[in-house]
């Protein structure tokens, strides 16, 4: 089968009488309810559940091994190859399956707020609630949007279609398969809506660097003077909390590109975690959950239809999807200039990284590649001890290219635009987990504020002798003694032992990167 046949198949599918094109949020909400796909909550949002899969399925994600891309992809456990033949067989099956549905829902929009670099996308859904999710998460076309001649990337989403690993070349009945040559993503066997969002992000992480644009898994905001700040950080580091700032406007909460003219949001909406969400702690997210929003796997009271954000009955990974304009404090369109400050957030449960340090370009590249945080792992006896977690470029599951490509682009951007880079530890102080305490949020906010407002540019710096980090001697609103982690530990020997242990974990993790010896030497720990 050749690509002409695939295109013809797709056109035949899109013109089927059962296809509903570009329905409004209200129309899709009606469809969700009439088709019993979800319920309406007390605030007017749609709530859907996703069955067995309440998160991504990384082991079921593949990239088609094609002539034009096979020498560019960083093949391995994240980017698993699948043959063109297997893809085309599955494609035919999925298209046939979708044609037989009573109704299909199609959204046509974009990824990328900057018109120069936007990618047209077409999302074909078996479920109306998935189409509402896509409509609210991606960029919705406006009346004056020019028709693009570029062929769209198409998502074919068939959650109730299940693959047969014996004949289809998959690992299970679930599959997420990207073909760059056919500009197609096949998703089947999972109802988790986040697969659509992250598949488009993975594609942009391949396409944007080819145009000399750094694609980034980060949030971004801008101050009144046009000063842009980027926030990188893995789950639990405080990225959402710290980038939602009443004095600054949100550019985006999760995915961005950095071009020659500045930063732009890749999406048109937000996909916020909502476990333990409260109006007091995160009013912007809480108040965005209204008519047109989608709640995923959130427990809702049968009678009052009120959401219970503290209940993790379905999963800890409860989510809300809503268009970005449901937040008041935003930039429109979602673009701004070059960043003046970049913040890497980590939650170090060993309690040995400083609460804030300023990084050289090489250190920035090193810590970007490392993508460190720690998580607390339970044991049978209920005792918890920290575990190191490294996620390359703070977004390892979504990077099709070798890691050094992104790190070198970051280094180049820092050189060209003079951004200051900071490593901020939102984790433990005065000892590790169990003996120390979590860094006070008010202190972290004060440190981040000082960093992004340029107040640390001329600060006196003290160089840490284990990690080589440059720690400010003073930060407005923060007690001086907590800035040096060793000062907060009663047992200095134990501090040193734990710090050297973590430094060695960094070095061990860094061995996996090719073409990075110079970065490791200039940016890594000193011990």
From Swiss-Prot:
It catalyses: oxaloacetate + ATP = phosphoenolpyruvate + ADP + CO2. The keyword Nucleotide-binding applies. PROSITE patterns: PEPCK_ATP (PS00532). It comes from the Bacteria. Pathway: Carbohydrate biosynthesis; gluconeogenesis. Coiled coil: none annotated. ATP binds at residues 198, 217, 233-241, 282, 319, 444. It is found in: Cytoplasm. Pfam families: PEPCK_ATP (PF01293). GO terms for molecular function: ATP binding; metal ion binding; phosphoenolpyruvate carboxykinase (ATP) activity. Its EC number is 4.1.1.49. Keywords: ATP-binding, Cytoplasm, Decarboxylase, Gluconeogenesis, Lyase, Manganese, Metal-binding, Nucleotide-binding. GO terms for biological process: gluconeogenesis. Binds 1 Mn(2+) ion per subunit. GO terms for cellular component: cytosol. It is an enzyme of class 4 (lyase). Mn(2+) binds at residues 198, 217, 254. Its cofactor is Mn(2+). InterPro entries: PEP_carboxykinase_ATP, PEP_carboxykinase_C, PEP_carboxykinase_N, PEPCK_ATP_CS. Substrate binds at residues 56, 192, 198, 319. Involved in the gluconeogenesis. Catalyzes the conversion of oxaloacetate (OAA) to phosphoenolpyruvate (PEP) through direct phosphoryl transfer between the nucleoside triphosphate and OAA. Belongs to the phosphoenolpyruvate carboxykinase (ATP) family. This is Phosphoenolpyruvate carboxykinase (ATP). It comes from Bacillus subtilis (strain 168). The gene is pckA.
